[in-house]
Structures are given as C-alpha cells and as structure tokens.
Amino acid sequence: MNFEETDSWKRASRLCVEIYKEFNSHQDYGFKDQITRSALSIPSNIAEGLERSSDKESIQFLNYARGSSAELRTQIYIGIEIGYIDKKIGLNWAQESKELSAMLMGLIKYLGNKR
C-alpha cells in the first residue's frame, strides 16, 4: 500500500502543516515543540507503518499514530484553555484528529482481518 495515496496520510499531513504554520512564531517553545511533534508523529507513523513488510508491524505503527492523535487532541484542548489556540480553529483540529483516529482504526481492523 502506497502511503502517499491514503486519505489518512494526506489528511494527517495537512493537519500537521496547519499546526506548524499556526505555531511558527509562537513564543512558548515548550508547548510549540510538544504540539508540533505530536502533529508530525501522526503522518510519520502512518508512512512508516504502511511501508513495513508485515501487517503486524503496520498495525503497530498505525496504533502509534492513533496514540499521537490522542496526544495531539489533548494538547489542542489545553491550548484552547490557556489561550494559545483560537477555539474555532482548535475544535476543527480536534475533530480532524478524531476522524483520523477513526480512519486509522478502520485500517487497523482491515489489516488485522487479512491474517
């Protein structure tokens, strides 16, 4: 499966780019570093998982991507609460993250059923 052609990788990459652009000049380096790392981890783990030779390995990395998505959502919610992220933008990002997690779960189930 070519990861560049999957909707999950495309959407995760777009979300990551949006977050990087939003936090480009942010002053709180610790928060900026954490949220951008979480965002980058999602498409990176999707890519790594889909390039693996076994379904078992692919599933492992797709689960890492789901974990990073949950981590990102947590940081988004906190960012909204502390005034670092506009509420409307943040809630859109959180929804996208939820949808990505659901897409990844579908892919994990598909790969798991191939065994």
Predicted segments with their positions:
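Amphipathic alpha-helical assembly/interaction segments
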Residues: 1-115
